[in-house]
């Protein structure tokens, strides 16, 4: 079996899937170069979107704010208020499925569904913190113009719309009020804002990283040449999922062509929760075509479909558990087949941890903070994949520490809390 594993590793190297091709420091250098170009507004795969939102100074005590969180899969609504110690209180929390996940919708149907989700809390505040987790061009009035819907959401006629204005219009159509003050932000900005709560220890600057259905990051920036030069510190969103990684190979490119939006968000498709499971199945099929696994197992793999990232995480942790969906979907019983599959999945998990760490590290480095004990960078981490995939998270954090602290002397700490996106959206909605 050792020979089989060695041959499998060689095949993954040839396909540019093996983690050895993805050195974290090299990746960070590439990302930082693209970030600089994006801030200048020229020739970058990273949007580097200014948000016109800065860190919170004072959070109003006791004032309610409505929060709407439109993510890659789930739609959440709630009412949030902060007590005198800065602690958030989340009330009336309701979770639904995002419109466009189960069936295609048009623009009106999409925003009507969002407005309907606020019916229970619409009369309790005139302020809305609207977290919309898709690429937007942010406006000085804190609305956001959608660049492109993604994460496999099926919604036609929505690209190019001002999402805050569309939400207000939908709420008026539903008889849910007229005068609304809406602040639009995405999930990474919301996570960063949550980390600015005064209850946290002192810090020099802020960044945030999201690894859920999708992937993104943001940080505080004051030097934005495309806005005309130095500005007051504000959150800049990388749109990191769109990074055009020069190290990406044909296996990833072939997988991208199977997705709903080929050519877009190609970095995200290498490791985010919405794609890691399907990518793993794609890699197993690639290996089956190369002659790996027993004949019976090759047949089962090539006929299989429907693996999710949660299935991959469970198999990676417990490969000998025959009750797991991964084992059942692939009808995998032979121990040699199990060992080969686990080795391939482990390569993808290690690569994912390096890709994730590269984005986190680049955002932290770009804050230009953390070089003395009083200026540590607070990095808020959020996302279902990051928190539930324990081994991926542990490896990512090890790579992050090795690069930032051991090699570069940058002090940072990771911030995590329940409902970070809801809390951060509430803070933004109150500013």
Predicted stretch roles:
Residues 1-93, 102-126, 172, 197-198, ...:
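ATP-binding/phosphotransfer module of carbohydrate and carboxylate kinases, centering on a glycine-rich
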Residues 19-53, 183, 207-210, 224, ...:
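Small-residue (GG/TT-enriched) beta-loop-alpha framework at ligand/catalytic clefts
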Residues 63-69, 127-129, 181-183, 206-210, ...:
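Short glycine-aspartate micro-motif
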Residues 75, 135-139, 215-218, 245:
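Short, acidic Gly/Pro/Ser/Thr-rich loop/turn segments
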Residues 79-81, 131-134, 186, 210-212, ...:
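Glycine-rich, histidine-containing beta strand-loop boundary motifs that form or position
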Residues 87-90, 152-158, 190-281, 285:
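Glycine-rich phosphate-binding loop of actin/hexokinase-like ATP-binding domains
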Residues 95-112, 136-200, 204-207, 228-247, ...:
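Glycine-rich phosphate-binding loop and adjoining helix at the ATP-binding site
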Residues 133-138, 188-191, 383-387, 419-421:
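Short, internal active-site loops enriched in acidic
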């Amino acid at each position: 079996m050792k020979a089989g594993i060695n041959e499998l590793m060689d095949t993954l190297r040839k396909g540019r899937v093996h983690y050895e091709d993805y050195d974290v420091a090299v990746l960070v250098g590439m990302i930082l170069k693209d970030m600089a170009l994006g801030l200048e507004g020229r020739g970058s795969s990273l949007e580097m979107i200014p948000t016109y939102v800065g860190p919170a100074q004072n959070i109003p005590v006791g004032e309610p704010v409505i929060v709407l969180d439109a993510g890659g899969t789930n739609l959440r609504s709630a009412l949030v208020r902060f007590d005198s110690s800065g602690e958030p209180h989340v009330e009336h929390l309701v979770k639904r499925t995002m419109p466009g996940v189960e069936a295609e919708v048009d623009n009106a149907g999409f925003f009507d569904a969002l407005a309907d989700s606020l019916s229970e809390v619409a009369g309790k505040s005139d302020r809305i913190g609207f977290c919309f987790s898709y690429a937007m061009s942010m406006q000085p009035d804190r609305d956001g113009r959608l660049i492109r819907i993604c994460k496999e959401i099926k919604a036609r006629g929505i690209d190019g719309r001002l999402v805050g204005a569309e939400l207000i219009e939908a709420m008026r159509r539903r008889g849910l009020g007229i005068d609304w003050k809406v602040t639009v932000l995405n999930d990474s900005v919301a996570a960063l804002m949550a980390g600015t709560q005064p209850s946290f220890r002192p810090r020099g600057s802020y960044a945030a990283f999201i690894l859920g259905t999708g992937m993104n990051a943001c940080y505080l920036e004051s030097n934005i040449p495309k806005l005309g030069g130095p500005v007051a510190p504000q959150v800049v969103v990388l749109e990191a999922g769109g990074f055009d990684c020069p190290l990406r190979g044909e296996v990833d490119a072939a997988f991208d062509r199977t997705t709903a939006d080929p050519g877009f968000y190609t970095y995200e498709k290498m490791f985010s929760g919405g794609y890691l499971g399907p990518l793993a199945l794609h890699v197993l099929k690639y290996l089956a075509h190369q002659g790996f696994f027993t004949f019976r197992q090759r047949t089962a793999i090539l006929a299989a479909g429907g693996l999710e990232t949660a299935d991959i995480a469970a198999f990676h942790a417990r490969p000998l558990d025959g009750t797991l969906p991964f084992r059942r979907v692939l009808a995998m019983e032979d121990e040699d087949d199990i060992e080969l599959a686990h080795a391939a999945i482990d390569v993808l998990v290690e690569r994912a941890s390096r890709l994730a760490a590269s984005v986190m590290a680049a955002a932290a480095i770009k804050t230009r903070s953390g070089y003395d004990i009083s200026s540590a960078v607070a990095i808020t981490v959020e996302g279902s994949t990051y928190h539930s995939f324990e081994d991926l998270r542990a490896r990512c954090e090890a790579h992050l520490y090795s690069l930032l602290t051991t090699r570069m002397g940058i002090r940072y700490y990771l911030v995590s809390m329940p409902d970070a996106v809801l809390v951060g959206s509430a803070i933004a909605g109150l500013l």
